[in-house]
């Protein structure tokens, strides 16, 4: 299989939607980014695409209340899902977001991969595990990025990485776990490579079904 090197810096914003009913037609291929409200999803998307404000970052966790879609090239999209688990968001809104997340993961046919971002200091909270379990149940491959890796010394960082990898082994899913830090540019290349592999694999599958 030939791995195509996609130009993520050409990525552009398409639309926002409150739930899957308001998303564009379920065609093409999508990789979704999920994580707690302070995990650094928007910063990761901006670092991947080398665009400072493609995904809106905020000092106030929980500002990503919509499903935000970005087009890498025709038919290939990145999806920024609503951040979850932020305490100051009203319960009704939390339930609404979680319903939107669940529906997207379980019903969106063009979803081919899920990137789950977790603060390396506080990984595998209940909702993180639920997202990964949903993906494994739907046979969607997962890349876990342990963000803010620069906040820990190398020994503690390695220990956290091993703990998370060991904890996820029991799920028997297609799960890769890596460090990630935007300021230190750790893990950005691995994310780029993983997305290229996912998009290329799907392109081959589509070609073989023609």
UniProtKB/Swiss-Prot annotation:
Residues that bind GTP: 35-42, 62-66, 80-83, 147-150, 180-182
A GO term for molecular function: metal ion binding
Keywords tagged on the record: Cell cycle, Cell division, GTP-binding, Magnesium, Metal-binding, Nucleotide-binding, Septation
UniProt-listed InterPro entries: G_ENGB_dom, GTP-bd, GTP-bd_ribosome_bio_YsxC, P-loop_NTPase
PROSITE patterns, per database record: G_ENGB
GO cellular component, one term: cytosol
GO biological process, one term: division septum assembly
CDD domains attached to this UniProt entry: YihA_EngB
Cofactor: Mg(2+)
Pfam entry (one): MMR_HSR1
Every EngB-type G domain range: 27-201
Keyword Transferase carried by entry: no
Positions of Mg(2+) binding: 42, 64
Function comment: Necessary for normal cell division and for the maintenance of normal septation.
PANTHER family associated with the record: ENGB-TYPE G DOMAIN-CONTAINING PROTEIN, MSS1/TRME-RELATED GTP-BINDING PROTEIN
HAMAP family for the chain: GTPase_EngB
UniProt similarity note: Belongs to the TRAFAC class TrmE-Era-EngA-EngB-Septin-like GTPase superfamily. EngB GTPase family.
Protein name per UniProt: Probable GTP-binding protein EngB
Gene from which the chain derives: engB
């Amino acid at each position: 299989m030939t791995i195509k090197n996609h130009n993520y810096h050409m990525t552009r914003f398409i639309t926002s939607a409150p739930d899957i009913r308001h998303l564009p037609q379920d065609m093409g291929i999508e990789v979704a980014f999920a994580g707690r409200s302070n995990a650094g999803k928007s910063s990761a998307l901006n670092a991947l695409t080398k665009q400072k404000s493609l995904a809106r970052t905020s000092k106030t966790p929980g500002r990503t209340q919509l499903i935000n879609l970005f087009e890498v090239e025709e038919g290939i999209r990145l999806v920024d899902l609503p951040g979850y688990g932020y305490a100051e968001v009203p319960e009704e809104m939390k339930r609404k977001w979680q319903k939107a997340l669940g529906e997207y993961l379980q019903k969106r046919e063009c979803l081919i991969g899920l990137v789950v971002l977790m603060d390396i200091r506080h990984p595998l909270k209940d909702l993180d595990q639920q997202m990964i379990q949903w993906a494994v149940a739907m046979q969607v491959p997962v890349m876990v990025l342990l963000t803010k890796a620069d906040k820990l010394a190398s020994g503690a960082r390695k220990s956290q990485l091993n703990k998370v990898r060991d904890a996820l082994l029991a799920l028997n899913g297609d799960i890769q776990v890596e460090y990630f830090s935007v300021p230190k540019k750790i893990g950005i290349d691995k994310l780029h490579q993983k997305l290229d592999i996912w998009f290329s694999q799907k392109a081959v599958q589509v070609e073989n079904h023609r």
